[in-house]
């Protein structure tokens, strides 16, 4: 497979499930759908339509690199990226540290560079200049792709493009099975992953009969089954209705708070960021804000200048302040907002 295929195809079920981590894989989509339905836990041979070249990381153990702080899992240093054929940079010297166990939301309008940044976190793209370290491993090190993609799992926008099996539990089993995990361990991982996203009772269902939010939760379960330390979600709710969005955000928040999984959420929905530990705002390939949700959203004029909205509670208090009120713009919750307004009315 070409480097363009390996690094730039972003909405691909193999990248989602981590199988590309094993090497360069090219396949016929229809063949997958015809052959994938087999009993869970039984080894599947690679069909003849695959062209497979194992990474060197499968053949030898390599030492973990250096460069992370004690608490960070991802370190980004002076990251520049230009897409082939483009003159303008998509990322312009971005430097960030992502701490273990944190919930980080990345905001920005279309073309801000947020999705390009996401694709650098598990080596779908590699830097034109600078470096990205995942658990101390440079993403530009092709011999370590397996380690990188075992550490960082990806979930993309369209759940229909991420599901490859005809039964929910078979889909969740796809990645660990092709990583060579033992059948009993696969069974444990699948059951555990589906329970974590509240989809265990649907394990025998056909994915195409599920709602959009349920499909995306199955996609997340497929990543959880790989047992990554980090899950990156690139606008996972973009194609969902409000109910589906709420289901997905509730799921990823629980994974972070209860299981300690690091979550990086790429989104343009302000409401999805309120529960994050940290909000990063991007514009034209640069980071223009990086702080707690309260401090970022209180910069209402900055957000509006970038074509972004703020939570409804912040907008309400901002407008009231323009008319002589004195309300804190850091109260993001409805109950907090109501209490602050009640204080002013006394």
List the model feature ranges, each with a label.
Residues 206-210, 214:
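Conserved ABC ATPase signature
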Residues 184-202:
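Conserved ABC ATPase "signature" region
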Residues 107-109:
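The feature captures the beta-strand-to-loop junction immediately N-terminal to the Walker
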Residues 1-5:
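Short, small-residue-biased leader/transition segments that mark boundaries at the very start
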Residues 122:
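Helix-to-loop junction immediately C-terminal to a conserved catalytic motif
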Residues 70-73, 81-93, 142-144, 183:
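A short, flexible loop at the N-terminus of ABC-type nucleotide-binding domains that lies
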Residues 231-234:
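Catalytic Walker B motif of ABC-type/P-loop ATPase nucleotide-binding domains
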